[in-house]
């Protein structure tokens, strides 16, 4: 009987932890237009639709450097919870978005501040460098000497 209760307790804990694990939201053309920029309505001007700055990771499943930075993006969901949105765009599945932002080399990270134009970085950087970009570009905080 103790074994049954122990197993049920363990199973419920695993289910609960899986439900609270946060991953960046995957964007499609449609959700990108809803949450980031409706480029069909405003094709000449980037008008950000979000209520917080965002970071968008353009990636592909087969890309080694993309897999390397994926845990950073997941960590930023927690570190900057309530301050920024973290999104992902699969360049193999969302070719129109990849072409629009000229994501020819990946990983490519697009930093979208509340005001101004998005800034992009290409390549895999150390986590601390992404944190510095988030702090200065997205949150407007002073650069921290490392």
Model regions and ranges:
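A short beta-strand-turn-helix
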Residues: 28-53
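Extracytoplasmic/secreted proteins, especially bacterial periplasmic and envelope-associated proteins
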Residues: 31, 54-57, 68, 72, ...
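Structural micro-motif
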Residues: 53, 95, 101-110
């Amino acid at each position: 009987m103790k074994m049954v209760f122990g197993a049920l307790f363990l199973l419920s804990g695993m289910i609960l932890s899986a439900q609270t694990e946060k991953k960046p939201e995957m964007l499609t053309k449609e959700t990108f237009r809803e949450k980031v920029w409706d480029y069909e309505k405003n094709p000449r001007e980037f008008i950000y639709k979000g209520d917080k700055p965002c970071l968008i990771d353009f990636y592909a499943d087969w890309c080694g450097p993309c897999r390397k930075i994926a845990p950073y993006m997941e960590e930023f969901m927690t570190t900057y919870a309530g301050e920024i949105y973290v999104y992902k765009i699969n360049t193999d599945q969302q070719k129109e978005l990849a072409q629009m932002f000229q994501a020819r080399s990946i990983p490519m990270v697009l930093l979208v501040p509340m005001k101004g134009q998005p800034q992009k970085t290409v390549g895999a950087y150390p986590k601390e460098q992404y944190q510095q970009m988030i702090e200065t570009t997205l949150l407007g905080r002073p650069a921290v000497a490392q």
